[in-house]
Amino acid sequence: ALRVDNGKAAFVVARRTNVNLLASPFLSWSWHVEPHGGTAHPVGLVVGFHGGDPESRSWGGQAYAWLGRDLPPNDRMISLVWGESALRRGAIDPPSKAGRDARYTQRGGIENTRTWWLETVDISEIYARIWPADDLAAARVMFVGISTAGTGAEGAAFISGILISR
């Protein structure tokens, strides 16, 4: 398991994937979240997508468009978070005004910390709920990563076994 601590600066550590969303719609992982300040935990997962948005620019002809230190091209992103309450499980915080980033509460609550949880979600179903007008068949999962909020608030999480499957 990888221990991830929130710090003063936000960061994302991501694995490039570039797989069709409908061909591999399931995301699985295990996590053990330490108690935190009672708000949403500052450590979570993030999934980046490209191609589903009808307004997306093509990058297919740019062979090296997703090499280097930056995140691969993406037009949509979903953060999978540990919410402030177990009752928020399955809740979606709508995208920002730009329509790119949304937040999905996978699990939550202080009462559920200090234990390992195995999670499996259908990211195609979550994507379709957030952006119903997008073309799911054209959407690609560009990366999966671990992110921190960078708020400086105390909060550690152990994350293991991140896997995209069909």
Please describe what each predicted stretch is.
Residues A1-V12:
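Short carbohydrate-recognition loop motifs
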Residues R16-L27, I110-T113, A137-A138:
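Extracellular/lumenal carbohydrate-interaction signature centered on repeated Trp-anchored short motifs
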Residues A23-P35, M142-T148:
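A short beta-strand element within beta-rich, extracytoplasmic domains
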Residues S30-H36, H50, S124:
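Solvent-exposed strand-to-loop "edge" motifs in beta-rich extracellular domains
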Residues G37-H50, E55-R57:
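Beta-strand acidic-aromatic groove motif in beta-rich domains, primarily in extracellular
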Residues V43-L45, K97-G109, T113-A156:
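Extracellular beta-strand ligand-recognition surfaces/modules
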Residues G52-G99:
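Extracellular/luminal beta-rich ligand-recognition
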Residues V144, S160-I164:
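Extracellular beta-strand elements of beta-rich domains used
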